[in-house]
Design a protein with these regions (language model features):
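Short acidic, glycine/proline-enriched helix-loop-strand junctions
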Residues: 236-239, 281-284
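Acidic/glycine-rich phosphate/pyrophosphate-binding loops and surrounding catalytic core
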Residues: 2-212, 216, 228-233, 239-241, ...
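Short glycine/threonine-rich catalytic loop with a Thr-x-Gly-x-Asp
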Residues: 241-243, 278
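Short secondary-structure boundary segments
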Residues: 221, 244, 265-266
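Structured adenosyl-cofactor binding patch, chiefly the S-adenosyl-L-methionine
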Residues: 272-281
Length: 284
């Protein structure tokens, strides 16, 4: 759940932008059939099993349209929900309920889908020391929602933005003239409290990263045999992250290597939505 400062400064402007995108000048369909205020109620129903996430954002869509809208929740973020389950009732002006329906559901379906998919992957890491991380491969202007959803699903957030930590990827290394030079420059520039992570693609780069004193070494798109050799080279001198081609099918083999982190862009860019709907709208 977002605190009030985050909600007002960071979340509300994004929701308002989404509402402006959808409503523009008016909701011509609603205004065609509802010319006067009329109080109503509608049910929020889950249409498949999953992990619910984004209830605060769902509610905020309606209250930004009309502060008198009330939502009665029967579940909370992180709960496992079942197909057909009644999760909430929304009370308010029917025009508000109709105007906000699609935007509210878009957020809730997307966030719940990410939480559900993350939960299924995180379950495969239980009993191991390996932590599941997301990436910055998020939908533009939706990172605050998508990374929150990863946490609700049982994953962990990697960098939120470029200010959060030093990650030297292939192009940084190329621009600097090599792994050792890149790490040395980062150590000189970045505050000492910031860890320095280096992305490596082969065993020679692994050796350079270790010798340069990198705090975290990311093994990117390496074969299983290469990763086994890399772990021997690193030998506890740095934390190890694995990224690239991470699937539910191969994740057990990755944890067997003893890596500290597994990062997956799929948590945010490939998670399917959770099917949720607003049904049974009626006047009260």
């Amino acid at each position: 759940m977002y605190d009030q400062v985050t909600l007002k400064l960071n979340v509300d402007p994004l929701i308002l932008s989404a509402l402006k995108e959808d409503i523009t000048s008016e909701d011509v369909s609603t205004n065609s059939v509802m010319s006067h205020p009329q109080q109503g109620e509608v049910d929020l129903i889950c249409k498949e099993d999953g992990i619910i996430c984004g209830l605060q954002v769902f509610e905020r869509v309606f209250t930004l349209l009309d502060e008198n809208t009330k939502v009665e929740f029967f579940v909370k973020d992180g709960d496992e929900v079942k197909k057909g389950e009644l999760m909430a009732k929304v009370h308010g002006d029917i025009r508000t309920l109709l105007c906000g329906e699609r935007t509210a559901l878009n957020y809730l379906q997307r966030m719940s889908g990410i939480a559900t998919y993350t939960h299924s992957v995180a379950a495969l890491l239980k009993g191991t020391k390996t932590k599941l991380l997301d990436t910055r491969k998020t939908t533009p202007n939706n990172r605050i929602f998508e990374k929150y959803s990863v946490r609700v699903g049982g994953g962990n957030n990697h960098r939120y933005n470029l200010s959060d930590g030093v990650m030297l990827k292939d192009n940084h290394i190329g621009a600097a003239g090599g792994v050792k030079k890149a790490v040395a420059m980062a150590k000189e520039y970045a505050p000492f409290v910031r860890k320095i992570e280096v992305e490596v693609e082969n065993l020679d780069m692994v050796k350079e990263a270790v010798e340069a004193g990198a705090d975290i070494i990311m093994l990117d798109n390496m074969s299983h045999e290469q990763m086994q050799e890399a772990m021997k080279i690193i030998d506890g001198k740095a934390e190890v992250e694995v990224s690239g081609n991470v699937t539910k099918e191969n994740i057990a083999r990755l944890t067997d290597l003893g890596v500290d982190f597994i990062s997956s862009g799929a948590l945010t860019h490939s998670a399917p939505i959770l099917d949720i709907s607003l049904k049974n709208l009626h006047a009260v």
